[in-house]
Amino acid sequence: MTQEVLERSIQVGGRTMTFQTGKIGKQAGGAIFCRYGDTVVSAFATGSAQPREGIDFFPLTVEFEERLYAAGKIPGGFIKREGRPSEKAILSARLIDRPIRPLFPEGYRNDVQVVAQVMSVDQDCASDITGINAASAALTISNVPFEGPVAAVTVGLIGDEFIINPTVEQSEKSVMHLTVAGTKDAVMMVEAGAQEVPEAQMLEAIMFGHREIQRIAEFIENYRLEALERNLAKPKQEVVMKQMPEEIVQAVKAFAYDKMDQAVRTEEKKAREEAIRQVKEEALAHFAEQYPEDLKTIDKILEDFVHKIVRRLITVEHIRPDGRALDEIRPISVEVGILPRTHGTGLFTRGQTQVLTVATLGAVGDEQILDGLGLEESKRYMHHYNFPPYSVGETRPMRGPGRREIGHGALAERALLPVIPNENDFPYTIRLVSEVLESNGSSSMASVCGSTLSLMDAGVPVKSPVAGIAMGLISEENHIAILSDIQGMEDHDGDMDFKVAGTSQGVTALQMDIKIKGVSREILERALTQAKEGRLFILDKMLSVIEKPRPELSPFAPRIITASIHPDKIREVIGPGGKTIKKIIDETGVKIDIEDDGRVFISAVDGEAGENALKIIQALTQEVEVGRIYNGRVTRIMDFGAFVEVIPGVLGLSGKEGLVHISQLAHGRVEKVEDVVKLGDEILVKATGIDKQGRLNLSRKEALPNPNPNPNGSTANKNPRNS
């Protein structure tokens, strides 16, 4: 049996990206085997034949499956198979979801599932970027009514040069890691981390990436056309949208539209929600007898009214639901140090959004070890974001962080990363936890502000303070409104959620999600400019409360002492089976971390305990210097000489000792060792050498003045002064 296979390639960032269909996953709606360098991601897109009844959302799910065989690894643990998705897999799934979600027909209610499976990993060719392009191609050739294709690239910046899909080596030099996704016509999604890059340069990077995206998207579209000719792509499913009965729409409009308009204009969130609920209840009760079978339809009509009213108020009347101007930021309240025993706290309140961020400082050994498909590495700065149901007045089970919480935590972490001091300057592991106590939009950016406050309160010497703001967009016919500091309703009924974080000098993080078919350069430029104005305003509010990091750490934070030993001496500190280092820890109550290069980090809440541990380590690793005179203690007496300890032992461990041969005990002849020294005596000795077996030779004679300095036994000066 001969199978038809279509394989085509395109050059992206100086490497070949190959798309293949017809060989694998032929029962899926669309299947693509995508290879970029040596990274291979297989993407499968499948949609249900019928819409799901009784829902008012699009049931799209995206799974990003990491297989450890892709990196030549076997999973650890007892079960030896992959378990829950890693944080990286969750973020990659979100990265695929966000640009494709807006490109399905409005009102489409069929289940759609996209699965991206990582089968081989080349560290220089990112699996998430490969996954977006593969998923887009799979949807494009499937029967699912996808209005793509989209494509994605990463943009780096080294010097003044933009780089498409930088390698690992290039990424280390780059001051920007920008992921852009879009169609041929517009940008759909932006995700970035940067080292205070100016807004103008960030905009140029986005447009630079989009030019490459246009080329890839056109390639995928041509690939679909060729696949259709070969019967390897499926005709698109016809979408039949259920129309609202015009009679009911007009009846509900006549009864409820003006009332809903007044309800939406209520400025306070809870009062507004209650007013909208009352209008809905009143309308449903009014039409219950006339249209008993259409109450769900009526509820949907009322929701559409809210959506349209909000958009019209903002774009035509320039009135926001809470009465603010389009570029106005909600009232801000800032507090620090509100928890007594934590290392640092920041309470940031903006309108009805409130976040408490707590900073905890730990030892080097507290860093997170990352062991996935990428290179094995560790993370010494972490940010965790929690969004409990009470923050929006709801109840639901609390079963650990969801995808949204992981995504928001990663965004806030990325925003602060460029200003975190390096390990040499501040050898601490830093964990931030943001607790959303109240939310009416923009809680992730409030977490960024709270993070800066808590770090400064903890005494972490951040390079610059960082603030964040969420921008919105509503585009209605010929009217465009860009909103600063969007609240929940504006996010829900708007077209864009554009989060921007940074310092006074530039951008450190970006994230843009949209619900329309893309945004233009002009809109991006306006949003970035307006975001900078808002960010600087917020920074001023924060700095009026805490201007710079505290000069001292919290008394409850550990003190870290750093030292350096020769790498060959590491085994002496650790000891056989770790016995020595365990003894030091038990004796002093400190934490000790030793790097392979000989750096030692001693972490102790009690500074004196840390100093004691340092003295022990110094004693264990101290080298005897040949030619130096030591005050030693006689530990053993033999017929041929005495053993003298020149560096005392610690923790019951032996110190460093050497042999003073009987001939080296004194300047004259010695008949018996005990005639000169006794056990326990403290004597001056000179280190004279170390033999090939590592044994130390000492001399008491050379440490003492010679009573007969000349060969004739005279004590006269060898060079008597001339008379």
From Swiss-Prot:
InterPro entries: ExoRNase_PH_dom1 (IPR001247), ExoRNase_PH_dom2 (IPR015847), ExoRNase_PH_dom2_sf (IPR036345), KH_dom (IPR004087), KH_dom_type_1 (IPR004088), KH_dom_type_1_sf (IPR036612), NA-bd_OB-fold (IPR012340), PNPase (IPR012162)
Compartments, as annotated in UniProt: Cytoplasm
PROSITE patterns attached to this UniProt entry: KH_TYPE_1, S1
Domain KH span(s) in chain numbering: 558-617
Biased composition range(s): Polar residues: 711-723
Taxonomic superkingdom: Bacteria
Enzyme class: transferase
UniProt-listed Pfam families: KH_1, PNPase, RNase_PH, RNase_PH_C, S1
One GO biological process term: mRNA catabolic process
Sorted UniProt keywords: Cytoplasm, Magnesium, Metal-binding, Nucleotidyltransferase, RNA-binding, Transferase
Gene Ontology CC entries for this record: cytosol
Binding annotation for Mg(2+): 491, 497
EC number assigned by the record: 2.7.7.8
Catalyzed reactions: RNA(n+1) + phosphate = RNA(n) + a ribonucleoside 5'-diphosphate
Cofactor: Mg(2+)
Residue ranges of domain S1 motif in the record: 627-701
Region (Disordered): 696-723
GO MF: 3'-5'-RNA exonuclease activity; magnesium ion binding; polyribonucleotide nucleotidyltransferase activity; RNA binding
Record-stated family: Belongs to the polyribonucleotide nucleotidyltransferase family.
Function: Involved in mRNA degradation. Catalyzes the phosphorolysis of single-stranded polyribonucleotides processively in the 3'- to 5'-direction.
This protein's name: Polyribonucleotide nucleotidyltransferase
Species: Desulfitobacterium hafniense (strain DSM 10664 / DCB-2)
Lineage: Bacteria, Bacillati, Bacillota, Clostridia, Eubacteriales
